[in-house]
């Protein structure tokens, strides 16, 4: 009578995906959930950004009551309306929008370099360096965005253009704050070796999010560069509300 041969014990390969220390699930499963959550956040941000772009374009094209932007609309003689105040001020300079976007692009490039290095080559040092540089440039972009807002030649009540531009810049600040918050976590986790060649989904998600932030900046830069003076120089005039 032959004795059954026992099954060989499972071996642990160096390339085996580790399990989560909290749930015991494969890190691939955790990564898949993380990607789904990331796309939900991106869809939410896309919806808000597109709404701002549409609002900007709508107000720019209508120029109702000549209230699009400083120094006010050029009204014809038969459209004189004393209830319309002539706004004073200037449009925002265009180059700071492009400069700030350039800084964000550099930060995103560093993050992608670090992520690709650790995923394909297992270069842990490149991820630490890339995420740290991305964090520094993101903070620089946030400071530059704040300086731009504080030096605008108009306030939020100086026409529809002023309000629309300020909202776009506020959206940029919100996106940059998320980027900085996430990058702080990436830097800390990469320094501790928690992000490596086997577990890289957090660096990937951060790279995806930063790519979307660049696209959001680009959409804002396009409208603030090529849609400045309203094409409607003969705007409609509507009555104003008066307190009885």
Where are these regions (language model features)?
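...captures the hydrophobic TM-helix bundle architecture rather than a specific catalytic motif
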Residues: 2-244
């Amino acid at each position: 009578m032959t004795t059954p041969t026992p099954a060989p014990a499972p071996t642990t390969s160096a390339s085996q995906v580790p399990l989560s220390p909290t749930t015991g699930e494969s890190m691939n499963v955790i990564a898949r959930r993380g990607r789904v959550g990331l796309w939900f956040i991106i869809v939410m941000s896309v919806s808000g950004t597109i709404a701002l772009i549409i609002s900007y374009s709508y107000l720019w094209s209508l120029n109702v009551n000549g209230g699009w932007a400083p120094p006010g609309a050029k009204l014809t003689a038969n459209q004189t309306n004393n209830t319309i105040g002539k706004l004073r001020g200037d449009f925002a300079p265009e180059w700071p929008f492009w400069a700030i976007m350039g800084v964000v692009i550099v930060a995103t490039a560093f993050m992608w370099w670090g992520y690709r290095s650790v995923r394909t080559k297992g270069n842990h040092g490149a991820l630490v360096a890339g995420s740290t540089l991305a964090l520094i440039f993101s903070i620089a972009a946030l400071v530059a965005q704040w300086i731009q807002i504080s030096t605008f030649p108009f306030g939020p009540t100086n026409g529809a253009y002023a309000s629309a531009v300020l909202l776009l810049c506020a959206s940029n600040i919100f996106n940059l704050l998320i980027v900085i918050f996430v990058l702080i976590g990436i830097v800390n986790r990469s320094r501790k070796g928690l992000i490596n060649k086997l577990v890289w989904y957090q660096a990937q998600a951060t790279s995806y999010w930063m790519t979307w932030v660049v696209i959001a900046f680009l959409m804002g830069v396009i409208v603030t560069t090529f849609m400045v003076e309203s094409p409607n120089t003969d705007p409609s005039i509507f009555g104003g509300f008066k307190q009885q």
